[in-house]
Swiss-Prot record:
Pfam families: RuvX (PF03652)
Gene Ontology BP term (one): rRNA 5'-end processing
UniProt subcellular location: Cytoplasm
Job of this protein: Could be a nuclease involved in processing of the 5'-end of pre-16S rRNA.
Family of the protein in this entry: Belongs to the YqgF nuclease family.
UniProt-listed Enzyme Commission number(s): 3.1.-.-
GO cellular component, one term: cytosol
Highest taxon listed in the record's lineage: Bacteria
Name this polypeptide is given: Putative pre-16S rRNA nuclease
Broad class of the protein's primary localization: cytoplasm
UniProt keyword Nuclease, yes or no: yes
CDD domains registered for this protein in UniProt: YqgF (cd16964)
Length: 144
């Protein structure tokens, strides 16, 4: 399996959780939370991470409804992801992100790092979970 530089994104209306992976493409790590303001500012903040980490692919969590359909938020996420692809010329890979925020909260609570006032930590951890799922799927697909 060839190493990949991927950036995981948990895109919400107010914040974007950001995660990166190690040089081998095996382990995802939470990086930061971007407070959304304008499209230009959001793109500039993401551009910083793309340049700093030499990103080759953007992995975006897609918030399917529990019945598997694409709701309003999922369509907004896809629209923003298309803007990312156009702005940076990078491929977009989608990951089903149902319940990743709940999983992120539970992990942070177990680590005694959860604070209701710091929702950005949940977004970062959700982005990490999204990216880790993608990395693991990629690893399984490359095995004979």
């Amino acid at each position: 399996m060839k190493p990949v530089a991927a950036l995981g994104l948990d895109i919400g209306r107010k914040r974007i959780g950001v995660a990166g992976c190690d040089g081998l493409g095996l382990l995802a790590t939470a990086l930061t939370t971007i407070q959304r303001t304008t499209l230009e500012a959001d793109l500039a903040a993401i551009a910083h991470w793309i340049e700093q980490r030499h990103i080759q692919v953007l992995v975006v969590g897609l918030p399917y409804a529990m019945d598997g359909s694409l709701g309003k938020q999922a369509k907004q996420t896809q629209k923003f992801a298309r803007k990312l692809a156009e702005a940076f010329g990078l491929p977009i890979e989608y990951v089903d992100e149902r319940l990743t925020s709940v999983e992120a909260e539970n992990q942070l609570k177990a680590e005694k790092q959860y604070d209701r006032q710091q929702k950005g930590l949940v977004d970062q951890r959700a982005a990490q979970i999204i990216l880790q799922q993608w990395l693991e799927t990629r690893q399984c697909a490359s095995k004979p």
